[in-house]
Swiss-Prot record:
The protein's name in its UniProt record: Threonylcarbamoyl-AMP synthase
Chain's role: Required for the formation of a threonylcarbamoyl group on adenosine at position 37 (t(6)A37) in tRNAs that read codons beginning with adenine. Catalyzes the conversion of L-threonine, HCO(3)(-)/CO(2) and ATP to give threonylcarbamoyl-AMP (TC-AMP) as the acyladenylate intermediate, with the release of diphosphate.
NCBIfam families tied to this protein: L-threonylcarbamoyladenylate synthase
Upper taxonomic lineage: Bacteria, Pseudomonadati, Pseudomonadota, Gammaproteobacteria, Legionellales
One annotated GO biological process: tRNA threonylcarbamoyladenosine modification
GO cellular component: cytoplasm
Annotated ranges, domain YrdC-like: 5-186
Annotated InterPro entries: DHBP_synth_RibB-like_a/b_dom, Sua5-like_dom, TC-AMP_synthase, TC-AMP_synthase_SUA5
Enzyme class: transferase
Gene encoding the protein: tsaC
Length: 186
């Protein structure tokens, strides 16, 4: 990861200044920002042409980065979630009052993934918190896996691009309900 130190530091600086970045994830390039910066989230919504009602997925390097945003759930259900993390699995949890409405959208839940992607994980570690992780595409378009296409589609709308290898998965991560285990998206 030493090859990426400066790029990650630049991306973290951009995030702290309220910027929107692109970065590699388990499956596709993601667009993200500081989930607690309303202006940054509004900019991301504009870039993606996405409704605030849909909400966003958060990625984290570890559970403790996102735990305050969730209500407690049954320990057995939580153990089932932890069995899949870190990894390419997103789970929805009951949102706590700490979770901003612009993250949850019209939902009473919050979608979370503890990532195993080395660069995304390091990005969350250096940022010292979770990030919004939304596939790099505009509403209704396929997610982007190639940095050249990313630049062509988004141009200077994105403040910083962290280039790096994508994970081995070719589809966005599945989403499951943390309480019931129900599959919400495959």
């Amino acid at each position: 990861m030493d090859d990426y130190t400066q790029s990650i530091n630049d991306a973290v600086k951009c995030l702290r200044q309220g910027g929107v970045i692109a970065y590699p994830t388990e499956a596709v390039y993601g667009l993200g920002c500081d989930p607690f910066n309303h202006d940054a989230v509004a900019q991301l919504l504009t870039i993606k042409k996405r409704s605030i009602k849909k909400g966003f997925i958060l990625i984290a390097s570890e559970w403790k980065q996102v735990e305050p945003l969730t209500e407690p759930i049954d320990p057995k259900a939580l153990a089932r979630v932890f069995d899949t993390w870190p990894g390419p699995f997103t789970w929805t949890f009951p949102a706590s009052k700490e979770a901003p409405h612009w993250i949850t959208g019209q939902h009473s839940t919050i979608a979370i993934r503890v990532t195993a992607h080395p660069l995304a994980k390091l990005l969350c570690q250096r940022f010292a918190g979770p990030l919004i992780s939304s596939s790099a595409n505009q509403e209704g378009e396929p997610p982007i896996r190639d940095v050249k296409i990313l630049r062509l589609v988004f141009g200077n709308k994105i403040d910083k691009t962290l280039e790096g290898p994508l994970g081995p998965t070719h589809r966005p991560t599945p989403i499951r309900d943390a309480i019931t285990g129900e599959i919400l998206r495959l």
